[in-house]
Amino acid sequence: MASFPVVTLKTNLADYPVTLAMKDGRVTSSLVKLDYCGPKVANKGFKDMVRQNAYDAGELAIITYIQARAWGKPFVMLPAPVSGRFQHHCIGFNHELGPLAPKDIEGREVGVRTYSQTTGVWVRGILQHEYGVNLDKVTWRTLEDAHVTELQDPPNCKRLPAGSKLADMMMSGELAAAILGGDMPKDPRVQSLVPDPAAAAQAWYEREQLIPINHVFVVRQELSKQQPEVVREIYRMIVESRGFAPESTTRPPFGLEANRKGLQLAIDWSFEQKVIPRRLSVDELFDDTTAALGA
């Protein structure tokens, strides 16, 4: 059996249940060393990854990755989502200011950190397709630009002044609602814009049979082309690490075909919301090496 020198890769990866055994040393490799040199909060490294190629491997938000692929950035994904969740609960409003149904945000201002944020794309898609919201009639107020510099936000997207706090503006009524995800205030006045979001998410899952992907693992395209054995080894490590994680009902599966429907939906909603210049195919998200992983 041929032996290969150990390859060290600059890696940006957070501590997820599926990656923790890689991070804490329970899963190792004689072929590849992952140098976890990214920021403590991994998403703070996404801009550097797609703009400056700051890392060789690691996680990217799925919408950031789809954009990166659409604009020819040198990364390719493994069919290994490292996180996923239902998104119905991720948009809220202050119910003390009056009732608000999903359609009521038309003609109003809604806050989101960036227009192309993965949570924002999933939530807007749910609002459009499940509740009939015309997204073009909403003014989206943002704090930051996209991770990918090529994206031009649509005309109904306006930047807030520096230092603005979405949660505070939602609570005061300056914003009708805000997409905040895990940063939603733990305040009894906050109510989900989607009624009974847990039940809505369960009904959606029973119908669609997919869990929205949040972050995926990617590697440099050059690595996949020149050293496919290293990429296969990384996938093996992720699979082994995932085996240490407790069972979860909100974890996307591994493998291209198992994720095809979810990836297609992410592409479709990205295109509908004008965060990518064209509708990619699912197969364009992979190369020959990564498409075969888990097959």
Sequence positions of predicted segments:
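Immediate post-signal peptide segment of exported/extracytoplasmic ligand-binding proteins
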Residues: 1-10, 99-109, 272, 277-280
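Short helix-initiation/N-cap motifs at beta->coil->alpha
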Residues: 36-48, 100, 138-171, 258, ...
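Secondary-structure end/capping motifs
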Residues: 218, 223-277
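Tryptophan-rich aromatic "cage" segments
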Residues: 268-295
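Internal, conserved structured core segments that host functional sites
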Residues: 111-132, 142-155, 161-162, 167-180
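Secondary-structure boundary elements
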Residues: 98-103, 129-137, 168-174, 226
